[in-house]
Amino acid sequence: HLCEDVEKDLGNALQCLNPNGAIVMHDCLPPNQYYQERTQSPHASGWTGDTWKAYMKFRATREDIEMCVVDTDYGCGVVRYGTQELVQLDLENDLIYDNLEKNKVEWLNLVSVDNFVERLQG
């Protein structure tokens, strides 16, 4: 649930991924700022950590993968080989919760469950 660990895990998983495979990441859409703190907050009934920051680093730097977050269960990120338009971010300064909240649809490529199912069937 910590950005640096998730970033390492995702990078390693991509090296092993079958060309037609997919990686599913949990906890990419924290419901409030307390959920995304690096240690579990007493103000939140759950914890996503800052997983979303690792996801965003790949959205901002990897054109060779396709990514979206399905709007369910604190955000399920789906990563597979393909292409994506990079999100323009200052990785040192932009990755704060308020920015995520304002830009989550664009930044995460956030899709509904129904839209995701349509993509799979299409």
State where each predicted segment sits.
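A short alpha-helical cap/connector motif
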Residues: 1-122
